[in-house]
Amino acid sequence: MAMHTNGPVFAGWDGSVIQAQQLQQQLAQRVLLHDEVSATPQLLAGFDVGFEDDGQSTRAAAVLLDAHTLLPLETHVARVPTSMPYVPGLLSFRELPALLQALALLSRTPDLVFIDGQGIAHPRRLGIAAHFGVVTGLPCIGIAKQRLAGSFAEPGPERGDHTPILLGGAQIGWALRSKPRCNPLIVSPGHRVSMQGALGWNLRTLRSYRLPEPTRLADRLASRRGKMPALAADTPLLF
């Protein structure tokens, strides 16, 4: 599959892996690791990405939630041609176009975004949640199911137990036991969220599942090829 570099997401990129890595290093310098989330957030959003047609189509699911009840208010699925093949460490270049399309479908701007993927817990400190945050300017957190970079001590067995993930002596995220007898999640800030804020928001949005509600609902939507989770009562369906 060829790499397609058209559009503002890839402005200035010649399609090479080396330049993509250089762009990641440059964009990582723009990541803000302090809390700029509203003191009284009203809307959260969860995003997840999947692929169809043998990888030729990228599918991004977006769920807008009430920040207080964690009930879904809107669900959307965006599909775009896949821009490049899978390259380890460059997932954001593959997923970002579809995520931006899904974001554009939301009728309201979320106060905080949760993305299924890495934030700064990435070899070059720019996973998909960090890349998305820098491009959109939205506060963003990454929640991944597997470690990509760094090392950590196994957290305790109880829900909420956590240990820092370290890379080169610096903390890049948390290993969070979100559910007993489940592997820990990899939680890291993406943009405009602190290390403690990323952990705190994940704990606040957990229910009885392994994933926090924003990415759990987005994962359901993405994995069911457009089938929507139940929306809050009296909420209009928006497409």
Swiss-Prot record:
One GO term (biological process): DNA repair
Keyword Translocase applies: no
InterPro entries assigned: Endonuclease-V (IPR007581)
Highest taxon of source: Bacteria
Keyword line: Cytoplasm, DNA damage, DNA repair, Endonuclease, Hydrolase, Magnesium, Metal-binding, Nuclease
Record-marked site positions (Interaction with target DNA): Y86
Binding residues annotated for Mg(2+), in chain numbering: D48, D116
CDD domains: Endonuclease_V
One Pfam assignment: Endonuclease_5
Disulfide bond sites: none
GO molecular function, one term: single-stranded RNA binding
GO cellular component: cytoplasm
Coiled coil regions, renumbered to chain: none
EC number assigned by the record: 3.1.21.7
Cofactor(s) essential for the protein: Mg(2+)
Compartment list: Cytoplasm
Catalytic activity: Endonucleolytic cleavage at apurinic or apyrimidinic sites to products with a 5'-phosphate
Job description of the protein: DNA repair enzyme involved in the repair of deaminated bases. Selectively cleaves double-stranded DNA at the second phosphodiester bond 3' to a deoxyinosine leaving behind the intact lesion on the nicked DNA.
Family to which this protein belongs: Belongs to the endonuclease V family.
Entries under NCBIfam families matching the protein: PRK11617.1
Protein name per its UniProtKB record: Endonuclease V
